[in-house]
């Protein structure tokens, strides 16, 4: 398939505002796709280069892309920067500069194919080591050298994961169902269990509903975690799960999925980052302590202070997880324990449709606990709010966040936030917000992004809604660190205002929530303060407007 056909589809999607019309267009396009590229096309339409389970990324930010565009179009860096500031989009910048280019005789005239683009993106993602930046640039420039202006717009946007077509995974799910006449629920389930929208599209096309039913969990193909809703107290949480539930300590660590295919063990974060190399102690302990060949287990990696027995600050754990060099040295400095709480797959058997009580039993059967290395999360099964409250207070005394209350009969629903699992924490809830923009500072803060625009998802997780700006309470050192982080995510610039690729999540606390027409959500956070950057969360994990409304109602009642 010619990439130009896909670029035309992207452009049409960009112009359409109706979700129903987008679904219809995508369905029609997928039906016309050759079988050998339908998986790639489905991923590309969903603004993905790789399946959700695949932790690879291209490693190309906006700074590097500006250099690529300059070289590929024979422009200067300043020409690219000025045009980008005017257009607010590097894709449009590349398109405009290619239209101006007069050296067409030097270009490779072969048309770009969708399969070639996918292969080149794979090569870019695999480049590492000395000279990696230059090699990534060369590969990306190779695509742009053969691209027509419109193709360049979308190649650049794809590489930056910023397609701007208003299409999300759920949109493509519906389109797959419509295109191939299969059940939407089967498509959703197959996607949940495979974390691979491309695979789902190909199976729907070639094997229909029968093939979709066969898609299941597989070790080394990590899935999105099941998510918890918040409850105000343990009494409310127990009531939500039917009066009796499993109460577990909510550890202050990083949620991980541990996979074994019988030959090797790998560890993934909730954002599907492969952190196996950084946690050799967990890998070794799991090999010794789990009596099964193939498995998928869930747990919390916790950095413990050996002197106090209490958890170290979360940022220290992140330092350990993100470390790429001198692993043995940092392993001694920051020892990590694995506390397991769920079992999703054992030796060929998927357990996602099994009640939680049975999954916990299987976990207890296969795990031999070893103090300080691999343990089961402490649990009590109770219908007594007083007993649950005692567990809650003990968790806080131990330095942890609170408790989880789980429905004993609940199956496991990947990527879904529901009331089958609830979290109870001691203070006014914080919000996990996607950072979508910022403002360059003035005076002493010139050269630093001084405030950040926060957003949450709408009910359908289709659009981001603004809820306020955070800037107070951050010293210059923090602002320097954040500015460095966000500079490469700038996708639009107008005066002092910038817009970011929605990738980073801030956890913020605040004094109050008020109704306000100032922001697109209709609400404004009063005196928000940054608690931490949630490196363990992706933008899709941020909170929704429903949580904002609930907190607003609770605040109203207190007033």
Curated annotation (Swiss-Prot):
What this protein is called in its record is DNA ligase
Q: Which residues bind ATP?
A: 248, 255, 270, 300, 341, 417, 423
HAMAP family annotated for this entry? DNA_ligase (MF_00407)
EC identifiers of the protein: 6.5.1.1
| Active-site residues, Swiss-Prot/TrEMBL | 250 (n6-amp-lysine intermediate)
NCBIfam families, sorted: dnl1 (TIGR00574)
Catalyses which reaction(s)? ATP + (deoxyribonucleotide)n-3'-hydroxyl + 5'-phospho-(deoxyribonucleotide)m = (deoxyribonucleotide)n+m + AMP + diphosphate
Q: Provide any one GO MF term from the record.
A: DNA ligase (ATP) activity
Query: What's this chain's function?
Result: DNA ligase that seals nicks in double-stranded DNA during DNA replication, DNA recombination and DNA repair.
Keyword Lyase assigned to the entry: answer is: no
What organism does the UniProt record list as the source? Methanopyrus kandleri (strain AV19 / DSM 6324 / JCM 9639 / NBRC 100938)
Q: Which UniProt keywords apply?
A: ATP-binding, Cell cycle, Cell division, DNA damage, DNA recombination, DNA repair, DNA replication, Ligase, Magnesium, Metal-binding, Nucleotide-binding
The record's similarity note reads: Belongs to the ATP-dependent DNA ligase family.
Q: Name one GO biological process term.
A: DNA repair
Does this UniProt record's set of keywords contain DNA-binding? no
Q: Which coenzymes or cofactors are required?
A: Mg(2+)
Q: Which CDD domains match?
A: Adenylation_DNA_ligase_Arch_LigB (cd07901), OBF_DNA_ligase_Arch_LigB (cd07972)
For this protein, the record's SUPFAM superfamilies field holds: ATP-dependent DNA ligase DNA-binding domain (SSF117018), DNA ligase/mRNA capping enzyme, catalytic domain (SSF56091), Nucleic acid-binding proteins (SSF50249)
């Amino acid at each position: 398939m010619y990439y130009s056909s896909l670029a035309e589809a992207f452009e049409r999607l960009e112009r359409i505002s109706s979700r129903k019309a987008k679904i219809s267009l995508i369905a029609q396009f997928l039906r016309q796709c050759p079988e050998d590229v339908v998986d790639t096309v489905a991923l590309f339409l969903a603004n993905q280069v790789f399946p959700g389970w695949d932790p690879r990324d291209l490693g190309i930010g906006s700074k590097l892309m500006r250099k690529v565009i300059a070289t590929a179009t024979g422009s200067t860096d300043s020409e690219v920067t000025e045009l980008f500031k005017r257009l607010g989009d590097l894709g449009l910048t590349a398109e405009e500069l290619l239209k101006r280019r007069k050296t067409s005789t030097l270009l490779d005239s072969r048309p770009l194919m969708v399969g070639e683009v996918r292969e080149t993106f794979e090569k870019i993602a695999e480049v590492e080591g000395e000279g990696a930046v230059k090699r990534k640039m060369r590969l990306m420039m190779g695509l742009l050298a053969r691209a027509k202006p419109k193709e360049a717009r979308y190649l650049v946007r794809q590489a930056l994961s910023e397609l701007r077509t208003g299409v999300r995974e759920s949109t493509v799910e519906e389109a797959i169902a419509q295109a191939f006449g299969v059940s939407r629920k089967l498509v959703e389930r197959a996607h949940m269990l495979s974390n691979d929208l491309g695979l789902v599209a190909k199976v729907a096309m070639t094997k229909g509903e029968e093939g979709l039913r066969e898609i299941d969990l597989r070790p080394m193909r990590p899935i999105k975690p099941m998510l918890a809703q918040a409850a105000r107290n343990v009494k409310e949480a127990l009531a939500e799960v039917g009066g009796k539930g499993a109460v577990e300590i909510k550890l202050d660590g990083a949620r991980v999925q541990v996979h074994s295919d019988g030959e090797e063990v790998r560890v993934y974060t909730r954002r599907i980052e492969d952190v196996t190399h950084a946690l050799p102690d967990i890998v070794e302990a799991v090999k010794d302590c789990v009596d099964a060949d193939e498995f998928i287990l869930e747990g919390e990696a916790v950095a413990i202070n050996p002197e106090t027995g209490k958890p170290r600050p979360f940022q220290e754990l992140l330092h350990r997880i993100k470390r790429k060099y001198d692993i043995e040295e940092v392993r001694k400095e920051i020892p990590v324990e694995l506390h397991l709480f769920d079992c999703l797959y054992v030796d060929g058997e998927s357990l996602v449709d099994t009640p939680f009580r049975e999954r916990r039993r299987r976990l207890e059967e296969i795990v031999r606990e070893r103090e300080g290395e691999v343990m089961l999360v402490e649990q009590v099964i109770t219908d007594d709010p007083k007993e649950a409250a005692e567990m809650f207070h003990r968790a806080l005394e131990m330095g942890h966040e609170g408790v989880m209350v789980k429905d004993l009969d609940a199956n496991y629903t990947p990527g879904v936030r529901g009331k089958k699992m609830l979290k109870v924490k001691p203070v006014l809830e914080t919000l996990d917000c996607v950072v979508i923009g910022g403002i360059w500072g003035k005076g002493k803060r010139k050269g630093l992004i001084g405030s950040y625009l926060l957003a949450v998802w709408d009910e359908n997780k289709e659009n981001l809604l603004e809820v306020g700006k955070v800037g107070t309470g951050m010293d210059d050192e923090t602002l320097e660190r954040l500015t460095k982080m966000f500079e490469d995510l700038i996708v639009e610039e107008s005066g002092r205002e910038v817009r970011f690729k929605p990738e980073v999540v801030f956890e913020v606390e605040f004094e109050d929530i008020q109704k306000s027409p100032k922001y697109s959500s209709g609400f404004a956070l009063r005196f928000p303060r940054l608690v931490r950057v949630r490196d363990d969360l992706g933008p899709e994990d941020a909170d929704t407007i429903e949580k904002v409304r609930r907190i607003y109602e609770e605040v109203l009642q207190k007033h």
